[in-house]
Amino acid sequence: MKTLPVLPGQAASSRPSPVEIWQILLSRLLDQHYGLTLNDTPFADERVIEQHIEAGISLCDAVNFLVEKYALVRTDQPGFSACTRSQLINSIDILRARRATGLMTRDNYRTVNNITLGKYPEAK
């Protein structure tokens, strides 16, 4: 595996803040599963995200609250089937979003996991 050198002006380790992690994952989840953007939700305001993080609310619970409040319908599920599928997201959806957005790396796995689960100690 070849590693790339750090360019001048580029941070050696640019770790996103908890709010940025939520924004990245919310954008992915809302777009992929509900066809929405971050600006379509109260999470367009960083303060709302900060309040959720400080309150220890998980990302999954925050999204599912929006789904229930606004009766959102998942757009990523194929038509009707014999079994009714839930409109809510789950931990697998969040893991897939983390992988798709590059937030599944070994060096930040635990930190991102704690942030998405509402267990980020620095927020309290």
Swiss-Prot record:
Result of changing residue 65 to S: Slightly reduced toxicity, wild-type interaction with MreB, no longer interacts with FtsZ, no longer blocks cell division, cells become spheroid. No longer toxic, no altered morphology
Region: Required for interaction with MreB, residue numbers: 74-124
Keywords: Cell shape, Cytoplasm, Toxin-antitoxin system
Any one GO MF annotation of this record: cytoskeletal protein binding
Effects seen without this gene: No visible phenotype. Deletion of 3 type IV toxin genes (cbtA, ykfI, ypfJ) leads to a slight reduction in resistance to oxidative stress, has no effect on cell growth.
Entry's induction text: Expressed in mid-log phase at lower levels than toxin relE.
A GO CC annotation given for this chain: cytoplasm
Record localization: Cytoplasm
GO terms of biological process kind: autolysis; negative regulation of cytoskeleton organization; negative regulation of FtsZ-dependent cytokinesis; regulation of cell shape
Main localization, broad class: cytoplasm
Residue numbers spanned by region Sufficient for toxicity, toxin less stabile: 1-73
Pfam families for the chain: CbtA_toxin (PF06755)
Domains: entry comment: The N-terminal 15 residues are required for interaction with both FtsZ and MreB, while the C-terminal 63 residues are required for interaction with MreB.
Note: Encoded in prophage CP4-44.
Quaternary structure (record): Interacts with FtsZ. Interacts with MreB.
Task performed by this protein: Toxic component of a type IV toxin-antitoxin (TA) system. Acts as a dual toxin inhibitor that blocks cell division and cell elongation in genetically separable interactions with FtsZ and MreB. Interacts with cytoskeletal proteins FtsZ and MreB; inhibits FtsZ GTP-dependent polymerization and GTPase activity as well as MreB ATP-dependent polymerization. Binds to both the N- and C-terminus of FtsZ, likely blocking its polymerization and localization, leading to blockage of cell division.
Family membership: Belongs to the CbtA/YkfI/YpjF toxin family.
Protein name: Cytoskeleton-binding toxin CbtA
The gene coding this protein: cbtA
